[in-house]
Regions:
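Alpha-helix N-cap/loop-to-helix boundary motif
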Residues: 228, 262, 266-269, 295, ...
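Intrinsically disordered, low-complexity N-terminal segments that are enriched in acidic
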Residues: 2-185
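Hydrophobic/aromatic-rich core segments of domains that either
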Residues: 272-361
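Acidic low-complexity segments
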Residues: 154-160, 165-264
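Low-complexity, Gly/Ser/Thr/Pro-rich intrinsically disordered linker/tail segments
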Residues: 341-411
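A broad, low-specificity signal marking well-ordered, structured residues that form hydrophobic/aromatic
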Residues: 112, 129, 173, 261, ...
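Active-site nucleophilic cysteine motif
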Residues: 229-236, 265-281
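Short, well-ordered strand-loop elements centered on a beta-strand within folded domains, enriched
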Residues: 141-144, 265, 316-320
Length: 411
């Protein structure tokens, strides 16, 4: 876990909230021309339009306008009617894919390249830049086939590099690897209780997995007097899927308690709703642990977070609460595939939150919870996200293809 100064947190918030009211209203009217200022105030009140007050002025999240048209039901309907549903293609793909993999294991082999570029002159010429990039974790549904650099195994799976900064030039770090990913779906009618073998995954893990009063109240509402662990976990999964729409997230490092933030704002990205799910599960005595990395579905490749829960007679099973209920299907196994199931379009990098990198960073991290975008620093301090760019490419390859030759790719 990284401890940031108040000044650093405020600096990061200013980066995330750059737009004033006039700019935000203009951006909303680009999509919905006739919207009134009264309606904007109602969206602010409902938390659909996210802002903070900085130096006495309302400043809006850099992705607040797009999030508005995701989280407010009427605004979302308007957006879909005008532009179409940007998630329809993924739903169509899953509607065909998921029935094909239930009852068997699907395997995919991917070639993955990740590049991080520190902007020119962020670091003085001649200084050493230290860099950590993501790599495949040891995970039972994932096998590393080839990598051109040794992988450091910890909570966060990394490869480490150093380079010397040059004046006027970006400092570029790259890694490449090939891995196999497998799908999993556990279908069971067993409702027996688990044994309490994994107690470290039931306890609080501050600052985000904490059994606060809002968590206790919500648990009462969702769980009631239910004692069966499988049923409790499924009820939590269903409640989040029904009540918390996906929205792009502000930086986790600027949020005191992520599950409470989700409940207050009534939206969250994949990691935020996963932390809420994990906290509610742990509060109810269900072991839960973090898993994250990337989702690799064609045209939807992105960073992604999910988790695992432990139930007796099943052991650890994956849960992707962000993918949630598949509402296009009437088949219960399809609808709840991502409760105790995962597809093969995944890259796992992290097996927990807020771990230490290998070798350890000297300064605070840019991302204090997760690790996907890479981390960089020099002897003068951390290099934050606004000072570097990253990108990745992924290619599905034939299982029979030979591993790539690391000598032809280089470090």
């Amino acid at each position: 876990m990284c401890k940031l100064t108040k000044t650093e947190i405020e600096r990061r918030i200013k980066i995330d909230f750059p737009n004033d009211y006039d700019c935000t209203l203009l951006n909303i009217r680009d999509i919905m021309p006739d919207v009134s200022e009264k309606q904007v105030k109602l969206w602010e009140k409902s938390k659909a339009l996210e802002y903070v007050v900085i130096d006495g002025r309302k400043m809006y999240f850099r992705r607040a306008v797009r999030n508005l048209f995701r989280t407010d039901s009427r605004a979302r309907s308007y957006y879909i009617g005008k532009y179409g549903d940007d998630r329809a293609a993924r739903a169509e793909f899953l509607a065909k894919y998921l029935p094909e993999i239930i009852g068997k294991t699907d395997q995919k082999v991917f070639d993955f390249r990740f590049t991080l570029s520190v902007k020119p002159d962020v670091v003085p010429e001649g200084e050493t830049i230290r860099c950590w990039l993501p790599s495949p974790a040891e995970y039972r549904y994932q096998t590393l086939i080839s990598s051109h650099k040794n992988v450091k195994k910890s909570v966060h799976s990394t490869v480490y590099y150093e380079q010397t900064a040059q004046r006027g030039k970006p400092t570029v770090f790259s890694t490449r690897f090939r891995f196999r990913s497998r799908s999993f779906f556990y279908k069971t009618d067993d409702r027996s209780q688990y044994d309490n073998a994994d107690s470290k995954y039931i306890i609080e893990q501050p600052p985000h997995i904490v059994f606060t009063e809002p968590i206790r109240r919500l648990s009462e509402e969702i769980v009631g007097n239910e004692k069966d662990k499988h049923t409790i976990a499924k009820r939590i999964f269903t409640w989040i899927s029904d009540n918390i729409p996906w929205a792009a997230a502000r930086e986790y490092s600027t949020i005191d308690n992520i599950p409470e933030y989700v409940l207050h704002n009534r939206h969250g990205d994949c990691g935020q709703v996963t932390l809420l799910f994990m906290t509610l599960c742990r509060y109810n005595g269900i072991p839960a642990r973090w898993v994250s990395g990337f989702m690799l579905h064609t045209a939807y490749e992105n960073l992604h977070d999910w988790c695992e829960i432990y139930l007796d007679s099943t052991g650890w099973v994956p849960v992707d609460v962000s993918f949630g209920i598949q509402r296009y299907s009437e088949d219960e196994d399809i609808r709840y595939f991502y409760f105790m199931g995962i597809d093969a379009y995944r890259l796992v990098v992290n097996r927990g939150i807020s771990g230490e990198l290998s070798p350890p960073k000297t300064f605070e991290r840019s991302e204090c919870v997760d690790f996907q975008r890479g981390e960089v620093e020099w002897r003068g301090g951390n290099i934050y996200f606004d000072s570097f760019d990253y990108n990745f490419t992924v290619t599905e390859v034939s299982d029979c293809m030979q591993p790539f030759d690391s000598a032809t790719y280089g470090e």
